[in-house]
Amino acid sequence: KLGVGLAGKIVAPTVPFKPLFFMEDALKFRAAMPDFPFVYVGGVISRETADKAIENGFPMIQMGRAVLEDTDFVNKMKTDEKHCSGCEHSNFCIGRMYSKSMQCHKHCEDITPGLKKAVAQINAQNDKMERKLGYK
């Protein structure tokens, strides 16, 4: 707990989230190696973003945080075209994977009040940045 408290900003930095955040770079790889069956990784949070990745030539997609936050995410996305991940992109799960089981902060029973407060602050900062950048 002390380590996360001291190094939390390094492990779980405040970064504005953008759907399909690696698409621009991924398309450069696709252009350089058009016959290679790349898996798209990065910011697939809805049926719309999944479809965009596939339309851009990626035969497979990877979903991490969306499924970590809701293990039934793919089924919900199949039945509701507008369904979007409830992940708040606080990066808590990333920091946690190096010390404990990787979990979304929403589902952790052992999260401390201090970490809850830190996650809320990160979410507020991310939300502010995302609105400023026009991502929301």
Where do the PLM segments sit?
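Flavin-dependent oxidoreductase catalytic cores
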Residues: 1-136
